[in-house]
């Protein structure tokens, strides 16, 4: 923890300095590479970790080395991970997908914004200082057209986005030749289909079947295509967002960039404070990853925080506002039905979802059915016009392990399955949100229920937390559950930070949450047997056994922390080549002893072989040349 707490002014100044001086930055001894596709402009970024050679023999004067292959890894940092790209947050990122969107010819630019709220914000001169300068002219589908990746997939069309994803998901593993690195234990996939090589056609087929989604609003052309589905790599979402009492636009942009650096596949902007609209514009124009929101939060702000005053009209206006800004997926709590609310009465912790509690309060105060459920088809029509994916929210998720897997939770899940089928009628992409707080022995049922009742739509869970006793460490308690449910088939894990249940996360909390969840996602990929998932582990183990300390640091998810921990006790440069660490010291290092045993065994084998040959030579009479019949 930091010894001195910064003031609000200092925090904003630091964040402003961060974005003013932002440059593309590579991780230590890594370089950005690109793999091109067949579609024009498909140029898929990856990070390649360069490794040092292995000493295999020779003398001190003339050592002999064997090269180690560079390790390609999935990279979510976009232009921020390429030192060759000039970064200007004021101008935003390059519009990677714009030519692909335009080439399809099924969209049109809007001359007037559809949202009354957006019109009012644009007309307010007092917001000029906060406004992103290069506001995008939004597009929507032409009349009678649908512009979703699901629509294209069902038509048999392989889009550039799909080819981009196929290359990205393969992670350049075809470049790896070493059998040691390619070795992988068989996994247990629980019914997931994990092909050795992911093709663009496989991506198209998974999207067409509804088993995967590509969150890619036509008004967020800056985003790099990615996919969420159980037959692909497990993904991680990071939540950011300001509140009424803390954080600023500068800090949220800083958190966005920071999140993508540490591996966030998507980012949700959960802002509830002032300037939600302006904050979101800055985030979208500078985000290389899909952005999700919970529109009910902003709709509530528009009615001064009074849930009973919410209306369909205010909510619809918010959907249009956010869709035209470029939000890639909406969390919609349409499954919180009036008849389900009494089911939560006997719970220990009631309704803990913000969106769920808002809708429950509205339903009870009006004694009417949830207006999101009533107007769900209209929501789908809006999403189909911009390609906004739906993340059907679990407003009745359990907030304690005592409430796990109860009647209310699964009643809502079944309704989400019904809504999924309706969304698919409109070619709208759907994923399903899940819990929450669930003890380990009850986790798998959540996955099997979701697959059965939600028709294999991708599952997206918050953890789940496996115990409730560790405030301040809930990234651990939830990381355990996340690894398990990812193994069982969950497609995306929403990170939990150390501040969960305690406060709004800062930059360091975001990093801690992401590292924890990248570990969980990777562990799930290994357990499922995802092809190529073990390459980085094998490279790390090989570097560890060969005492290549620099390579160990650089292969780590967090190279900086790995190096810092090592250097706390062995800070000298000699410690980076030593055949031991400070835990065991030079006399008791198990790997050093293993190497000595291996060398000794090899020497003994040679000596025994020589002795056998000598004995054989004497047994044959000591003749240098053997007769033909003896040879």
Swiss-Prot record:
One of its GO terms (molecular function) is carbon-carbon lyase activity. It catalyses: 5-amino-1-(5-phospho-beta-D-ribosyl)imidazole + S-adenosyl-L-methionine = 4-amino-2-methyl-5-(phosphooxymethyl)pyrimidine + CO + 5'-deoxyadenosine + formate + L-methionine + 3 H(+). The keyword S-adenosyl-L-methionine applies. One of its GO terms (biological process) is thiamine biosynthetic process. It holds the Pfam family ThiC_Rad_SAM. Substrate binds at residues 239, 268, 297, 333, 353-355, 394-397, 433, 460. [4Fe-4S] cluster binds at residues 581, 584, 589. Binds 1 [4Fe-4S] cluster per subunit. The cluster is coordinated with 3 cysteines and an exchangeable S-adenosyl-L-methionine. Its EC number is 4.1.99.17. Pathway: Cofactor biosynthesis; thiamine diphosphate biosynthesis. Keywords: 4Fe-4S, Iron, Iron-sulfur, Lyase, Metal-binding, S-adenosyl-L-methionine, Thiamine biosynthesis, Zinc. Its cofactor is [4Fe-4S] cluster. One of its GO terms (cellular component) is cytosol. It is an enzyme of class 4 (lyase). Zn(2+) binds at residues 437, 501. Gene3D superfamilies: 6.10.250.620, Radical SAM ThiC family, central domain. Homodimer. Belongs to the ThiC family. Catalyzes the synthesis of the hydroxymethylpyrimidine phosphate (HMP-P) moiety of thiamine from aminoimidazole ribotide (AIR) in a radical S-adenosyl-L-methionine (SAM)-dependent reaction. This is Phosphomethylpyrimidine synthase. The gene is thiC.
């Amino acid at each position: 923890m930091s010894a001195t707490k910064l003031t609000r002014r200092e925090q904003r100044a630091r964040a402003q300095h961060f974005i003013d001086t932002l440059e593309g930055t590579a991780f230590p001894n890594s370089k950005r590479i690109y793999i091109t596709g067949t579609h024009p402009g498909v140029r898929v970024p990856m990070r390649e970790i360069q490794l040092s050679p292995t000493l295999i023999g020779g003398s001190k004067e003339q050592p002999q080395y064997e090269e180690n292959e560079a390790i390609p890894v999935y990279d979510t940092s976009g232009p921020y991970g390429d030192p060759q790209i000039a970064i200007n947050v004021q101008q935003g990122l390059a519009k990677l997908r714009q030519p692909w969107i335009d080439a399809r010819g099924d969209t049109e630019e809007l001359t007037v914004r559809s949202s009354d709220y957006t019109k009012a914000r644009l007309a307010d001169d007092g917001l000029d200082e906060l406004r992103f300068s290069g506001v995008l002219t939004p597009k929507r589908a032409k009349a009678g057209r649908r512009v979703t990746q699901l629509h294209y997939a069902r038509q048999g069309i392989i889009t550039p986005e799909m080819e981009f994803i196929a290359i990205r998901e393969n992670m350049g593993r075809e470049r790896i030749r070493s059998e040691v690195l390619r070795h992988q234990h068989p996994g247990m996939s629980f019914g997931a289909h994990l092909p050795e090589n992911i093709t663009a056609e496989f991506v198209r087929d998974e999207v067409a079947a509804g088993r995967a989604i590509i969150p890619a609003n036509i008004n967020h052309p800056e985003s790099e295509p990615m996919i969420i589905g159980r037959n692909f790599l497990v993904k991680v979402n990071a939540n950011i967002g300001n509140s009424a009492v803390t954080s600023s636009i500068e800090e949220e942009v800083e958190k966005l960039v920071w999140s993508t650096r540490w591996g966030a596949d998507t980012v949700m902007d959960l802002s509830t404070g002032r300037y939600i609209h302006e904050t979101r514009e800055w985030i979208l124009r500078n985000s290389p990853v899909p952005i999700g929101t919970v529109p009910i939060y902003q709709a509530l702000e528009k009615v001064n925080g009074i849930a009973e005053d919410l209306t369909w009209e205010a909510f619809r206006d918010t959907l249009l506002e956010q869709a035209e800004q470029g939000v890639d997926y909406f969390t919609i709590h349409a499954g919180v039905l009036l008849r389900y609310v009494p089911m939560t009465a006997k719970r220990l912790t009631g309704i803990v979802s913000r969106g769920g509690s808002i809708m429950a309060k509205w339903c009870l105060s009006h004694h009417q059915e949830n207006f999101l459920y009533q107007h769900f088809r209209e929501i789908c029509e809006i999403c189909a016009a911009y390609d906004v994916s739906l993340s059907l929210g679990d407003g009745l998720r359990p907030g304690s392990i005592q409430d796990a897997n109860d009647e209310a939770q699964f009643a809502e899940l079944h309704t989400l399955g019904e809504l999924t089928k309706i969304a698919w009628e409109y070619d709208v992409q759907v994923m399903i949100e899940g819990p929450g707080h669930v003890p380990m022995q009850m986790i798998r049922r959540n996955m099997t229920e979701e697959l059965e009742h939600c028709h294999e739509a991708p599952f997206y869970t918050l953890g789940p937390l496996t115990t409730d006793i560790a405030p301040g460490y809930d990234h651990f308690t939830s990381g355990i559950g996340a690894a398990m449910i990812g193994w069982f088939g969950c497609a995306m894990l929403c990170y939990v930070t150390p501040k969960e249940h305690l406060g709004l996360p800062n930059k360091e909390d975001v990093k801690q949450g992401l590292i924890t969840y990248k570990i969980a996602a990777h562990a799930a990929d290994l357990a499922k047997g995802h092809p190529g998932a073990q390459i980085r582990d094998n490279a790390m183990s090989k570097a560890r056994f060969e005492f290549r300390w620099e390579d160990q640091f650089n292969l780590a998810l967090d190279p900086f922390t790995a190096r810092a921990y090592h250097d706390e006790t062995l800070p000298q440069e000699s410690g980076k080549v030593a055949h031991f660490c400070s835990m065991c010291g030079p006399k008791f290092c198990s790997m050093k002893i293993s190497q000595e045993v291996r060398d000794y065994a090899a020497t003994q084998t040679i000596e025994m072989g020589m002795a056998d040959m000598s004995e054989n030579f004497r047994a044959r009479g000591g003749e240098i040349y053997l007769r033909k019949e003896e040879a």
